[in-house]
């Protein structure tokens, strides 16, 4: 494969020296960009974007053509795995993801197949290899998947949820069923991420979007334990380089020490954590990614710059920090403000890497 022209993202994840703090944004290929909206209109709908490797490649590269980002992230969706299990994923306009089938009993879960990454999710692997080829070494490519708990909530609820009442009822009423579902999902995520790595992903991230909804005890048993299982099963070196693993639990600030213990290279932080305190708490065990509040991007560029400066100062000197938002960029953000954010990270961080 082509040598990387910019590897500071991978170097920071592995706590190797960098010249400036690398930066990318969760959902950087998204609705805030007019070129993304045009591609989505051409594709017809969101899933057609995901399932066509050429469209997926096109939208993955759009933010890189606009901004000096230090990483690309595969354009896809965390719900491709439940879709490949036969749940029938579709998107209602303005309502987010829905499933035609849900799981509610042990029998439902026992009947679920474990998808084959190449056969059932081959379109994702094709997208990864297409993007790697088109990137031609500009920056590394990140692959990703949802955490078992997060995927399970969508499969049990049938879509997004405010209180996760069906998922949590199953967790407490029928833990055997929930554990079986999570185990099947952990196996599926492991093979899916390994497929992405073999197709060319140079780092992978596990998105535990709803882990923070759980009690401390339930988080350890029903979310963290399964992410640990995935991390232990991932390919960690490919194409002559280490493949770093990032784990991100939104709302996981209470459990940073536990998350840092599961064997991942990097811990993603949401905006409710102080990154300097997080660095003290986890020590040298992992690198950190984050963690500006995405809504800061609605402020003026000078205010964005001030917040970037504050977070950089909180983290302090040295490598081991990848700058990101504390969650995904939102659709109404002015693209110029995203550019101001990225430029501020590069301009203001050099002093911390002398």
From Swiss-Prot:
Main location: cytoplasm
Residues holding substrate: 27-31, 77, 154, 209, 327
CDD domains the record matches: URO-D
Keyword terms, alphabetized: Cytoplasm, Decarboxylase, Lyase, Porphyrin biosynthesis
Keyword Nuclease attributed: no
Enzyme Commission identifier(s): 4.1.1.37
Site annotation Transition state stabilizer: residues: 77
Molecular functions per Gene Ontology: uroporphyrinogen decarboxylase activity
InterPro entries listed in its UniProt record: UROD/MetE-like_sf, Uroporphyrinogen_deCO2ase_HemE, Uroporphyrinogen_deCOase
Pfam families listed in its UniProt record: URO-D
Reaction(s) the record says it catalyses: uroporphyrinogen III + 4 H(+) = coproporphyrinogen III + 4 CO2
Pathway: Porphyrin-containing compound metabolism; protoporphyrin-IX biosynthesis; coproporphyrinogen-III from 5-aminolevulinate: step 4/4
Enzyme's top EC category: lyase
Localization per record: Cytoplasm
GO biological process, one term: protoporphyrinogen IX biosynthetic process from glutamate
HAMAP family attached to this UniProt entry: URO_D
Quaternary structure and interacting proteins, as annotated: Homodimer.
Family the UniProt entry places it in: Belongs to the uroporphyrinogen decarboxylase family.
UniProt name for this protein: Uroporphyrinogen decarboxylase
Source organism of the structure: Pseudomonas syringae pv. syringae (strain B728a)
Gene that encodes the chain: hemE
